[in-house]
Amino acid sequence: MSNKAILCVDDERTVLLGLRDQIAKHFGDRYRYETAESVDEAWEVIEELSEDGIENFIIVSDWLMPGVRGDEFLIQIHQQFPKIVTVMLTGHVDEAAIERVRRSANLHAYLAKPWSEDHLISVIRSGLRRFDDENSNPVHR
């Protein structure tokens, strides 16, 4: 099993399955794919991934969800797991939220709904390259 995972978080099941299916179609069985319909469920999945020894993963999270918004969630993620690559997805452009996540959560990319499959795959590919770059260029102390 891969030591890398891609977690998609969105309260709309059709969006969630569309994301997962498009990503899995392009990357096959090289990665573990997870979905969550809420921030609470996402935290459970993250805990499960950590227990399985998976530390390199990408989170694609919707911005507007019930309870905790995606920008707040990604900031919390970055505070606890700074190496996780974060991508925010939204149909409602909130430039202030995007900028806040860029500054506070090292946002890798922002995708507008509806997204193009090519752009989604390009964003995921570049996020995965960040893991490869970190592993091939270790910091010497």
Residues covered by each model-derived region:
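C-terminal output helix
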Residues: 115-126
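Short amphipathic alpha-helix used as the core "switch/output" element in two-component signaling
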Residues: 44, 71-83
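Receiver (REC) domain active-site loop signature in two-component systems and cognate sites
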Residues: 65
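Conserved acidic segment of CheY-like receiver
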Residues: 3-23, 59, 120
